[in-house]
Amino acid sequence: MKQPGEELQETLTELDDRAVVDYLIKNPEFFIRNARAVEAIRVPHPVRGTVSLVEWHMARARNHIHVLEENMALLMEQAIANEGLFYRLLYLQRSLTAASSLDDMLMRFHRWARDLGLAGASLRLFPDRWRLGAPSNHTHLALSRQSFEPLRIQRLGQEQHYLGPLNGPELLVVLPEAKAVGSVAMSMLGSDADLGVVLFTSRDASHYQQGQGTQLLHEIALMLPELLERWIERV
């Protein structure tokens, strides 16, 4: 417990500091009138013991400039990355729009993923949202929502995207014909995330990991349903 004298001393120190700051703000010419005294003021330094007020101010300025440079470099990196994402997405959209059939579109989508160094790209659709039954030949795209639900709960939870590995039974649900899948990027299709699933696969188990960016994946998951409606009717 602090003694009354200690509390009074802290109050006086706080008042003195405030009074000094207020005085300097109101009287900026103080530094001109007392330039020599200002040069003699020493400020505590963790390494050098003390430094002059001028050196201390210059060091703060250098640190501030360094932080600004780092922030600018980060903004430039983000701008370059966003530009790259934009052109990749634009190229994919143009390619898929030019498709002459659903099979052609799926092949173009798969080829686009291969050009990025991936094993491939796949689509699975929920049959309660798309007309996939006879007489159409799109039944291979159907994904039972009931079969997918345990995987969704385990891997996605409340999220729309999942990046990482899938075990054998999980792969049989979403990619029954896939081989040597190390990791996947999986996203729920549509703005309401209820139309199906888009999957990108890699043979590298560490290629897709939680915490990686999902902006491109998100944009593709929003773009695909409208393109699919050219070939498949919505329920």
From Swiss-Prot:
Entries under Pfam families matching the protein: DUF484 (PF04340)
UniProt cross-references to InterPro entries, sorted A to Z: DUF484, GAF-like_dom_sf
Top-rank taxon: Bacteria
TM region(s), chain numbering: none
PANTHER family: DUF484 DOMAIN-CONTAINING PROTEIN
NCBIfam families: PRK10963.1
Listed name of the protein: Uncharacterized protein YigA
Organism: Escherichia coli (strain K12)
Protein's gene: yigA
